[in-house]
Amino acid sequence: MRRPALALAAIVLASPLAAQQAGAPFTVQETGQGYATLDEAVGSIRMGRGTILIQPGTYHECTVQAGGDITFKAVQPGSVTFDGSPCEDKAIFVLRGRSSTVDGIIFRGVRVPDGNGAGIRTEMGNLTVTNSMFLDSQEGILGGEPTGQQIVIDKSTFSGLGTCDEAPDCAHSIYLANKGSVTITRSRFEKGTGGHYVKLRVPNVRIVDNSFDDTGGAKTNYMIDLPEGGTGVIANNSFVQGRNKENWTGFIVVAAENRTYRSTGLRIEANDARLAPGEARSPAFVASYSRDALAIGDNRLGAGVRKFETR
């Protein structure tokens, strides 16, 4: 008779712990351990590998990943918002691990004194971002490292980002630099507030199946800026350039600052580029400073959009 009593007592004692774990906003999936703050959950993984499940809610906190391979995942995509509160005057997620994955999270309202407040600041390790949103901040995703870093962004939204008024050298919706590659697919860019929508200082790019809607933009510049050149593919994107531009002269601009990377064979094809109603200026769809032979294929260009110009 004592064994059932002991078993019942164990259940009763375990119940508060189980309830605590179930109610924790941040849980490491592999261990089932819950944490009150994201930083505690990140610290528990250390140099290992783990997935942090995040319960629905709005959080005013940030984290620095110092190592390991960590996935930050919303239990319900789109139900988790990190609002303001950057770490190190940089970003809500400052990433210095071996790799990082961000899945289903909203980043909003990030501002820092130097004008480069971002949802994500990647400083080390590969990065994958999927099904996430970056809203109303100085920058969306910023950073990179001088290695063969691989960055992949998929099914994400960038809105209300960028500034040249608050940042000395401008902030952008996405601004990345590495010696590896950046892939951006099935994502939406809209309502920019300055700078470029995508600025990449990388040797290899893949920008495919995205939507760039600049009709609600203000003081924006290029849709895609590859300031040091680069190869790869820009295809199947739709572009609409708005009227409120700081620099309206090109949609895609190659090697405007340096010819660090060869641009020979950069494929730009099957895109659709148009001007917003009432826009009378005539930008180039592609403008190149590189002197390399780009592979510009068939693109659908609306009235007033010129195919190509050499600068």
Region spans (language model):
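Bacterial N-terminal signal peptides that target proteins for export
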Residues: 1-7
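N-terminal signal peptide c-region/cleavage motif recognized by signal peptidases
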Residues: 14-16
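Acidic Gly/Asp/Thr-rich repetitive segments characteristic of extracellular carbohydrate-active
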Residues: 23-55, 60-61
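Extracellular beta-strand-rich solenoid/capping regions of secreted or surface-exposed proteins
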Residues: 43, 47, 59-73, 81-103, ...
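Right-handed parallel beta-helix
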Residues: 55-56, 69, 73-79, 98-109, ...
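Extracellular beta-strand/beta-solenoid scaffold signature
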Residues: 84-93, 113-121, 136-145, 165-176, ...
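Leucine-rich solenoid repeat scaffolds
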Residues: 280-311
